[in-house]
Amino acid sequence: MAKKKANKQLIYVVMAALFAAIITVVTASVLHIPTGNGYIHLGDSFIFLAASLLPLPYAIAAAAVGAGLADALTAPIWVIATVIIKSLIVLPFTSKKDKIINARNLIALIPALIVTCVGYYLADRILFGAWDAFAAVIPNVIQVAANAAIYVIFGLALDAAGFKKKVLK
Protein backbone atom coordinates (compact mmCIF):
# COMPACT_ATOMS: atom_id res chain seq x y z
CA MET A 1 0.00 0.00 0.00
CA ALA A 2 2.78 2.44 0.89
CA LYS A 3 4.56 1.62 -2.38
CA LYS A 4 1.42 2.36 -4.39
CA LYS A 5 1.03 5.73 -2.63
CA ALA A 6 4.70 6.55 -3.24
CA ASN A 7 4.32 5.64 -6.93
CA LYS A 8 1.26 7.88 -7.24
CA GLN A 9 3.11 10.78 -5.60
CA LEU A 10 6.03 10.25 -7.97
CA ILE A 11 3.64 10.35 -10.93
CA TYR A 12 2.19 13.63 -9.60
CA VAL A 13 5.65 15.17 -9.14
CA VAL A 14 6.74 14.13 -12.63
CA MET A 15 3.50 15.38 -14.19
CA ALA A 16 3.75 18.69 -12.31
CA ALA A 17 7.31 19.14 -13.60
CA LEU A 18 6.24 18.27 -17.15
CA PHE A 19 3.33 20.71 -16.94
CA ALA A 20 5.63 23.42 -15.57
CA ALA A 21 7.98 22.90 -18.53
CA ILE A 22 5.13 22.89 -21.05
CA ILE A 23 3.57 25.99 -19.49
CA THR A 24 6.93 27.80 -19.62
CA VAL A 25 7.60 27.00 -23.27
CA VAL A 26 4.05 27.58 -24.51
CA THR A 27 3.70 30.82 -22.56
CA ALA A 28 7.08 32.25 -23.51
CA SER A 29 7.36 31.26 -27.14
CA VAL A 30 4.40 29.51 -28.79
CA LEU A 31 2.03 32.07 -30.34
CA HIS A 32 3.41 34.80 -28.11
CA ILE A 33 1.44 37.94 -29.11
CA PRO A 34 2.53 41.23 -27.48
CA THR A 35 -0.15 43.64 -26.27
CA GLY A 36 0.19 47.09 -24.75
CA ASN A 37 0.61 45.86 -21.17
CA GLY A 38 1.76 42.27 -21.63
CA TYR A 39 1.22 39.47 -24.11
CA ILE A 40 -1.37 36.93 -25.17
CA HIS A 41 -0.24 33.31 -24.96
CA LEU A 42 -1.65 29.79 -24.79
CA GLY A 43 0.00 28.71 -21.53
CA ASP A 44 -3.14 29.06 -19.44
CA SER A 45 -4.77 26.15 -21.29
CA PHE A 46 -2.09 23.90 -19.81
CA ILE A 47 -2.57 25.47 -16.39
CA PHE A 48 -6.26 24.56 -16.63
CA LEU A 49 -5.32 21.00 -17.68
CA ALA A 50 -2.85 20.67 -14.80
CA ALA A 51 -5.52 21.88 -12.39
CA SER A 52 -7.95 19.27 -13.77
CA LEU A 53 -5.47 16.40 -13.59
CA LEU A 54 -3.30 17.00 -10.52
CA PRO A 55 -4.11 17.40 -6.83
CA LEU A 56 -4.14 21.05 -5.77
CA PRO A 57 -0.58 21.44 -4.38
CA TYR A 58 0.93 19.92 -7.53
CA ALA A 59 -1.29 22.02 -9.81
CA ILE A 60 -0.35 25.20 -7.96
CA ALA A 61 3.35 24.33 -8.25
CA ALA A 62 3.06 23.60 -11.98
CA ALA A 63 1.19 26.86 -12.63
CA ALA A 64 3.41 29.06 -10.47
CA VAL A 65 6.72 27.60 -11.64
CA GLY A 66 5.74 27.36 -15.32
CA ALA A 67 4.20 30.81 -15.68
CA GLY A 68 6.77 32.39 -13.36
CA LEU A 69 9.67 31.05 -15.42
CA ALA A 70 8.00 32.22 -18.63
CA ASP A 71 7.73 35.74 -17.25
CA ALA A 72 11.28 35.59 -15.91
CA LEU A 73 12.37 34.90 -19.49
CA THR A 74 10.12 37.42 -21.25
CA ALA A 75 8.81 40.10 -18.87
CA PRO A 76 10.54 39.85 -15.47
CA ILE A 77 8.65 42.74 -13.88
CA TRP A 78 5.50 40.58 -13.91
CA VAL A 79 6.95 37.47 -12.19
CA ILE A 80 5.56 38.09 -8.70
CA ALA A 81 2.10 39.06 -9.94
CA THR A 82 2.02 36.10 -12.32
CA VAL A 83 3.02 33.56 -9.66
CA ILE A 84 0.22 34.82 -7.40
CA ILE A 85 -2.43 35.08 -10.13
CA LYS A 86 -1.66 31.72 -11.76
CA SER A 87 -1.62 30.03 -8.34
CA LEU A 88 -5.08 31.44 -7.67
CA ILE A 89 -6.65 30.46 -11.00
CA VAL A 90 -6.16 26.74 -10.31
CA LEU A 91 -8.16 26.83 -7.05
CA PRO A 92 -11.70 26.42 -8.49
CA PHE A 93 -10.76 23.39 -10.63
CA THR A 94 -10.97 19.80 -9.43
CA SER A 95 -8.95 16.70 -10.26
CA LYS A 96 -11.23 14.43 -8.24
CA LYS A 97 -13.76 13.72 -11.00
CA ASP A 98 -13.37 10.87 -13.47
CA LYS A 99 -13.31 13.25 -16.43
CA ILE A 100 -11.25 16.37 -17.10
CA ILE A 101 -14.17 18.18 -18.69
CA ASN A 102 -16.97 18.23 -16.13
CA ALA A 103 -19.44 20.83 -14.90
CA ARG A 104 -17.21 22.10 -12.10
CA ASN A 105 -14.17 22.56 -14.34
CA LEU A 106 -16.23 24.34 -16.99
CA ILE A 107 -17.65 26.69 -14.35
CA ALA A 108 -14.11 27.18 -12.96
CA LEU A 109 -13.21 29.00 -16.16
CA ILE A 110 -15.35 31.94 -15.01
CA PRO A 111 -13.42 32.62 -11.77
CA ALA A 112 -10.20 32.03 -13.74
CA LEU A 113 -11.24 34.83 -16.08
CA ILE A 114 -12.16 37.15 -13.21
CA VAL A 115 -8.96 36.47 -11.24
CA THR A 116 -6.83 36.98 -14.36
CA CYS A 117 -8.47 40.27 -15.34
CA VAL A 118 -8.68 41.73 -11.83
CA GLY A 119 -5.25 40.41 -10.82
CA TYR A 120 -3.39 41.86 -13.77
CA TYR A 121 -5.37 45.11 -13.55
CA LEU A 122 -4.30 45.51 -9.91
CA ALA A 123 -0.72 44.50 -10.69
CA ASP A 124 -0.59 47.06 -13.49
CA ARG A 125 -1.89 49.75 -11.15
CA ILE A 126 0.62 48.82 -8.43
CA LEU A 127 3.61 48.51 -10.78
CA PHE A 128 2.97 51.50 -12.97
CA GLY A 129 0.26 53.55 -11.24
CA ALA A 130 -1.33 53.88 -14.65
CA TRP A 131 -4.96 54.73 -15.07
CA ASP A 132 -4.88 53.03 -18.45
CA ALA A 133 -4.49 49.65 -16.75
CA PHE A 134 -8.12 48.97 -17.65
CA ALA A 135 -7.01 48.75 -21.30
CA ALA A 136 -5.33 45.43 -20.49
CA VAL A 137 -8.65 43.84 -19.52
CA ILE A 138 -9.73 43.17 -23.12
CA PRO A 139 -6.52 41.31 -24.09
CA ASN A 140 -6.84 39.30 -20.86
CA VAL A 141 -10.43 38.35 -21.73
CA ILE A 142 -9.29 37.27 -25.20
CA GLN A 143 -6.43 35.26 -23.71
CA VAL A 144 -8.59 33.43 -21.17
CA ALA A 145 -11.33 32.75 -23.76
CA ALA A 146 -8.83 31.32 -26.25
CA ASN A 147 -7.17 29.24 -23.54
CA ALA A 148 -10.55 28.01 -22.31
CA ALA A 149 -11.42 26.80 -25.82
CA ILE A 150 -8.08 24.99 -26.18
CA TYR A 151 -8.48 23.49 -22.70
CA VAL A 152 -11.91 22.11 -23.59
CA ILE A 153 -10.65 20.65 -26.89
CA PHE A 154 -7.60 19.02 -25.26
CA GLY A 155 -9.63 17.93 -22.24
CA LEU A 156 -12.28 16.24 -24.38
CA ALA A 157 -9.57 14.49 -26.40
CA LEU A 158 -7.83 13.24 -23.25
CA ASP A 159 -11.18 12.15 -21.79
CA ALA A 160 -12.00 10.23 -24.99
CA ALA A 161 -8.62 8.48 -24.71
CA GLY A 162 -9.30 7.58 -21.05
CA PHE A 163 -6.16 9.43 -19.94
CA LYS A 164 -7.07 9.85 -16.26
CA LYS A 165 -8.02 6.22 -15.83
CA LYS A 166 -4.92 4.93 -17.62
CA VAL A 167 -2.33 7.25 -16.09
CA LEU A 168 -3.62 8.56 -12.77
CA LYS A 169 -5.73 5.78 -11.26
Task: Tell me what each language-model feature is.
Residues 1-169:
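Loop-helix junctions at membrane interfaces
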